[in-house]
Amino acid sequence: MSTFQFTLAFLALLATQFSLRMLLALRHLWHVVRHRGAVPDAFRHTISLESHQRAADYTRAKIGLAVSELLVHTLWLLLLTVGGGLAWIQSALGTVWATAFPQEMPGPGLDYQVSLILVVVALGSLLDLPFSWWRHFRVDARFGFNRMSLR
């Protein structure tokens, strides 16, 4: 399999995964919006309409954030792979590594490879921080699940 064929297969699988996740999220959102106005019969005696609508609004907010997160993570994966981000990170880390440990060259060892993985994981975690902050301090706080503040 050539590099081009592998890239096409990767993009096809990524597009399939993105489409399915988006479809499921939108289906879930559509179902929640459609049934927001009435409590299901099985719960009619235990949950008030107001509580049911509040739960539906919370679910809508969480789905909206999840869709945004899915879009950003998909773009991040495309940037790392097809966009050459991983090669750029590897090159930059190689320069830093060669400066810090000149005696360890001519070939990257296991410690360099592990550090490359850790850098990519750290950058991905930094990408997750705004979503986590928004989830806890905006969405959860708006619905009364989080009473913490930044102060």
Please provide the spans of the model-predicted regions.
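Hydrophobic or amphipathic, alpha-helical segments that drive membrane association/targeting
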Residues: 1-151
